[in-house]
């Protein structure tokens, strides 16, 4: 899939901008909105660890701040290809359970998941009705 290649490439570039002086765990993300626009993010750590933010949430918040609300896919690149944390999965779920999650490592291996496979019982806006 051409979009997957582009998303993984952009996520890898975003990873280079990560600020991870404490964990040394750099993460990059690229989020494809249904509008066709792509938003990138990197993790930003803070000496007060709880104030750090993940790459996936940076990408989502950038997109939302530009008016996006519907997303198709997100690519996440780490050294060893780990999936997004629970908080990031929940933030993505806020905007739809049909988002494809692509994880890749720095060697080029990748896996793709449906968001609902990663967060099968996510809390959604419908739970508030």
Give the ranges of each region predicted by the language model.
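Zn2+-dependent cytidine deaminase-like catalytic core
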Residues: 40-127
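Short, compositionally biased leader-like segments
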Residues: 1-9, 69, 106-108
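Residue-level detector of intrinsically disordered, flexible termini
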Residues: 10-13, 29, 72, 86
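Short solvent-exposed loop/turn micro-motifs enriched in small/polar/acidic residues
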Residues: 22-24, 85
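Short, basic/aromatic recognition patches
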Residues: 5-20
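Short beta-strand scaffold segments in enzyme catalytic cores
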Residues: 26-33
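Short, surface-exposed loop/turn motifs that are enriched in glycine and acidic residues
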Residues: 1, 20, 48-49
